[in-house]
Amino acid sequence: MEGWQRAFVLHSRPWSETSLMLDVFTEESGRVRLVAKGARSKRSTLKGALQPFTPLLLRFGGRGEVKTLRSAEAVSLALPLSGITLYSGLYINELLSRVLEYETRFSELFFDYLHCIQSLAGDTGTPEPALRRFELALLGHLGYGVNFTHCAGSGEPVDGTMTYRYREEKGFIASVVIDNKTFTGRQLKALNAREFPDADTLRAAKRFTRMALKPYLGGKPLKSRELFRQFMPKRTVKTHYE
């Protein structure tokens, strides 16, 4: 654990007069809680680097739940997120902080996270496809495997012209009932391919990931979503979060 690890800061808060408490996501150790001693002092060279969306190399150690940051280096400047992409980045940071246990390795998820924020930084349109792909990847790494290609129970291949109802922990079954848990075969095929060519498939992906993530998030609302509603134009909020 004392070696260098690639990492990103998910969240930070003041800890004593001169230190920071960090929630970080690392390549080898997963989510880790760190104390950065002296990081808030005027002479500290760390404060500017220990920011969300800055690719970092960290070295830390300690025996308790809270580790001590030994060294930190910024690999590059922070990825340029602003406006809706900034709130989207804060959302995925909060999502990881809420659903990942401490010190559980998720190396592949680390690169899914990196790819997501890189996509957000280079996005000139909607961030929704990148967010949906990341949510689906996260669910997969958490062990929430869903078969989008075959009907639960019968095992029949999903038909693009039929409708299917989602049942938690089971999958999708053919259904003639249309409600919030119903998806078309076309939508399921888009979810499986992680490709969302139109607004219909994006809305379906959001419906599914919200349902699937709900057990992990519980009843506590996401702070990033509330911040988005407060500070972004109402039309944008409706488009991206409703």
Swiss-Prot record:
InterPro entries (UniProt xref): ARFGAP/RecO, DNA_rep/recomb_RecO_N, NA-bd_OB-fold, RecO, RecO_C
Keywords: DNA damage, DNA recombination, DNA repair
Domain of life: Bacteria
GO cellular component: bacterial nucleoid
GO biological process, alphabetically ordered: DNA recombination; double-strand break repair
Keyword Transmembrane helix on entry: no
Parts of the chain that traverse the membrane: none
PANTHER family: DNA REPAIR PROTEIN RECO
Family: Belongs to the RecO family.
NCBIfam families linked to this entry: reco
HAMAP family associated with the record: RecO (MF_00201)
Subunit structure: Monomer.
Function: Involved in DNA repair and RecF pathway recombination.
Designated name of the protein: DNA repair protein RecO
